[in-house]
Amino acid sequence: MPSFDVVSELNLMEVENAFNQARKEILQRFDFKGTSTDLERDKDENVVVKAGSEGRAEAALQVLMEKLAKRGVPLEGLDPQKLEPASGGSVRQLVKLKRGLKQEDAKRIVALMKESGLKVQAAIQGEAVRISGKKKDDLQAAMQAIRTGGLGVPLQFQNFRE
């Protein structure tokens, strides 16, 4: 019985490359000269934006998002938190990277498959959802339904088996 897995993963190598490009641009750009604006990675591989003002922090975040988009990293995989005041009158913002398919998102995918009326079965398996059906055409229709479902998380299809 043909099947595939629906997962939510970010290409961490591309995230690292985009992070380095954004950091380099912030260090070299004229409007950031003389400011304490910087990007850092924390121990959980999330991104921390540090800046002297809210406007600079937003601009630095925009540079990071621009570089991520150019490298093909889906921006739905980012979860920017609120700006927090930091020491010395500066601000910092944590940008969490969404990894793995959360339980509620997996349940929404299963519900979407049931609502679609396709002859497929969906089963939650940890941080993935396995979709199986009798025909390849049903699985391709399921992929299309998931893509157009508007779930708000970056999804990939893996392990397509016959």
From Swiss-Prot:
Kindly indicate whether the keyword Mitochondrion belongs to this entry: no
Keyword flag Metal-binding: no
CDD domains on file: YajQ_like
Q: Which domain of life is it from?
A: Bacteria
For this protein, what is any one GO molecular function term? Answer: nucleotide binding
Name of a matching Pfam family: DUF520
| Keywords for this protein | Nucleotide-binding
| GO CC, alphabetical | cytosol
Annotated function: Nucleotide-binding protein.
Which family does the record claim for this protein?
Belongs to the YajQ family.
What name does this protein carry? Nucleotide-binding protein Anae109_0095
What is the native source organism of this protein?
A: Anaeromyxobacter sp. (strain Fw109-5)
